[in-house]
């Protein structure tokens, strides 16, 4: 999740495809295998990562990007010493605008330099261009498709939205849960 200085964005067409489930499990596994691992909740439309780990969501990524917080808002997960989480914080009215700012790309580069692995949970592509913008600034993306749910046209559209971006496609996961 940090090959060549990249973070890995977990993306999918729709809500309920399993992005948060996949991102959290991947981050836990990477942390258990060794190396400092950061899980970033960049789903500023419907954040859930803080709930999975029972962490505070008072401040986080949205605060950093809007200049109201610093990186001290990254929280260590008690049960897994090498796992850290950057929650969303207050849900902003302008999530896509925040991730389009140069500050998001700069933050991702800084986080990749400080952690061995960086995994990023994203909003569903159906809600806007956030996921594609986030993936481009992460540098790598893993696409999720949900069995009997994801439409092939929506998957093609999502992959096509990344075509002009500097994104390494890590693959597609066919998910059933």
Regions found by a protein language model. Name each.
Residues 1-177:
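P-loop NTP-binding module
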């Amino acid at each position: 999740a940090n090959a060549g200085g990249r973070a890995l964005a977990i993306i999918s067409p729709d809500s309920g495809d399993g992005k948060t489930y996949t991102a959290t499990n991947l981050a836990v596994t990477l942390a258990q295998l060794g190396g400092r691992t950061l899980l970033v909740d960049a789903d500023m439309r419907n954040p859930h990562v803080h709930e999975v780990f029972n962490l505070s969501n008072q401040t986080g990524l949205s605060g950093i990007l809007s200049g109201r917080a610093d990186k001290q808002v990254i929280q260590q997960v008690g049960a897994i010493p090498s796992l850290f989480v950057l929650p969303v914080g207050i849900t902003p009215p302008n999530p896509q605008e925040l991730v389009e700012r140069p500050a998001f790309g700069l933050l991702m580069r800084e986080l990749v330099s400080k952690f061995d692995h960086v995994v990023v949970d994203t909003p569903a592509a159906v809600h806007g261009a956030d996921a594609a913008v986030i993936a481009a600034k992460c540098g790598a993306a893993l696409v999720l498709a949900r069995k009997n749910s994801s439409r092939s046209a929506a998957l093609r559209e999502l992959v096509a939205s990344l075509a002009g971006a500097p994104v390494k496609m890590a693959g597609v996961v066919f998910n059933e849960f």
